[in-house]
């Protein structure tokens, strides 16, 4: 049974016309691959409500029409390529920012945040500022900041592409573990073929804004790009 249904997303920009539809079961991962400029990141932003999705678009999540809801009401989280942490806030406050927006008290936020940071191996960094972190540490804080709100769907826009290969491999493995533990449904944009095959339950290839191929990871070959 489909948990997430995306129909007729459409946008015209930069001499490209983007069209996209997809379905996904609960707890599964859809991976979107394609060359730069094929519309992958734009699609994620349309799903998240950060960009208009077109007049005929429909997005249903858990049997609820979320097409016209604002981003903060969609129950969708997003992790970007750059961590985009607030430089003036300590890690504990960066990690719990979504809880602050929900009006949860500072004491309760920090109690929840400490548990999450420990889960992600960041418990010794609560009082540090973002500029003192490595790239991998900062991206893990970004993951915590998104997942702590317990969204039903998480969108990942090449979250590990700026990291070195060993760290990227480790965080890819960690992401699979976290998804099983937390139970979220995911859409991942990546250029990494092995990452796509390892994490995806379904893969879609985008070319110049159009869906060029859709299938299972074991059927996917690099020549399809």
Sequence positions of predicted segments:
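Conserved ABC ATPase signature
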Residues: 129-133, 137-139
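Catalytic Walker B motif of ABC-type/P-loop ATPase nucleotide-binding domains
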Residues: 154-157
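Conserved H-loop
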Residues: 183-189
């Amino acid at each position: 049974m489909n948990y997430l249904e995306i129909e007729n997303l459409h946008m015209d920009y930069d001499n490209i016309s983007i069209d996209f539809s997809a379905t996904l079961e609960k707890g599964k991962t859809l991976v979107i691959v394609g060359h730069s400029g094929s519309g992958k990141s734009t699609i994620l932003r349309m799903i998240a409500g950060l960009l208009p999705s077109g007049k005929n678009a429909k997005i249903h999540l858990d049997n609820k029409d979320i097409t016209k809801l604002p981003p903060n009401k969609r129950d969708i989280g997003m992790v970007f390529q750059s961590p985009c942490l607030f430089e003036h806030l300590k890690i504990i406050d960066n990690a719990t920012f979504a809880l602050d927006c929900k009006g949860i008290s500072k004491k309760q936020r920090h109690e929840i945040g400490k548990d999450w940071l420990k889960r992600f191996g960041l418990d010794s960094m609560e009082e540090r500022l973002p500029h003192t972190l490595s790239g991998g540490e900062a991206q893990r804080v970004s993951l915590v900041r998104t997942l702590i709100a317990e969204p039903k769907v998480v969108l990942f826009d090449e979250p590990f592409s700026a990291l070195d290969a060993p760290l990227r491999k480790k965080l890819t493995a960690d992401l699979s573990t976290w998804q099983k533990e937390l139970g979220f449904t995911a859409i991942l944009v990546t250029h990494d073929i092995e990452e796509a095959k390892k994490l995806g339950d379904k893969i879609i290839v985008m070319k110049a804004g159009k869906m060029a191929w859709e299938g299972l990871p074991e059927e996917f070959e690099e020549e399809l790009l």
